Amino acid sequence: YGNDNIMVKAGEIIGEIAVASLIYDVPAMVVCSHIKGHIQAGYAGAIKNVAMGGISSSHRHCGWKCGRGAMHTIGEGKLIWDEEKCELCLQCEEICPLEVIKFENEQFTYREADCWRCGRCARVCPEGALTLPGDDERFMKALAETAKAVLSTFKPNKVIYINFLTEIQPECDCMPAADVPVIQDQGILISDDIVAIEQAAIDMLLKAKPLPQSAASELGEKTDNILYDLSKKPYLIQIEEAGRLGLGSRQYELIEI
C-alpha cells in the first residue's frame, strides 16, 4: 500500500518501476516464497514474489502506472463491467483492497485513478461480469523484467531464495479463502539462483499427482502439466525470460539434506 520508492530502470516493456526504498537500501535479502497458483502468472514463486513484492503499488506522481499496475495491465487497463451478467452480489466491492469499487443505484462505479489493477474483483466475480484486459505473454515478461530491476539494486551473491512447496494452493495467497492443496507437500528448496530454484520447483510440481477434492482432482491422470491445466497461463515464459535476462540458469542439481 506504500509509495516510498525509488524509480529503477527495468526493461523494454516496463521501462522504469518503483522499487520499494527499503529493499533498494538494504545490502542483502532472503526471499521466502510460498509456491502456489496465480490468476495471471499461472505459477507464483520467487520471480513473482520479487517482482510484485519488491515494488510499490503506486508512485507519488505517476500512480499505479509506475507500480504494480504497470505489470497487471496493458494500455489503460480499464475495468469492464457487463451489466447483464451482474447479479449485484457485491463480492467485488467487498474484496477491493483500496475500496475503490461502489454500486450506486445498482450501477457499477470505481475510482479509476486510485485502482492499482490487481484483478481481485474480476477473479471473485461468480458470473464473469467484471473483466480486466491483459496480455499473458507481456505480463510474464514484465514479471521477469521487474524482478531484474529489484535484484539490480543488490551486489552479486547478496540474495538467497527459499521456496516452500507446501500447502500448494490453486490461487494466490492474497485471495480471501484457502482451498484444498492441489498436490502433496514437496519440501523446501534453497538456492542463490532464482532461475534454477524456479525451474526445480516447477519440475517437482509437474511430477506430483493431483490431490482428491482439490481444484485439480478432476484432472486426474489426464494431466502432465497441472500448472497450465489449472490456469491456462503460459507460466514458463517468466522463467525463460528471467534466464534470457541473465538472472540465472535453468540447469540445476538437486542435493537432499
Regions found by a protein language model. Give the residues of each.
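Extended, low-polarity segments enriched in aliphatic/aromatic residues
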Residues: 1-257
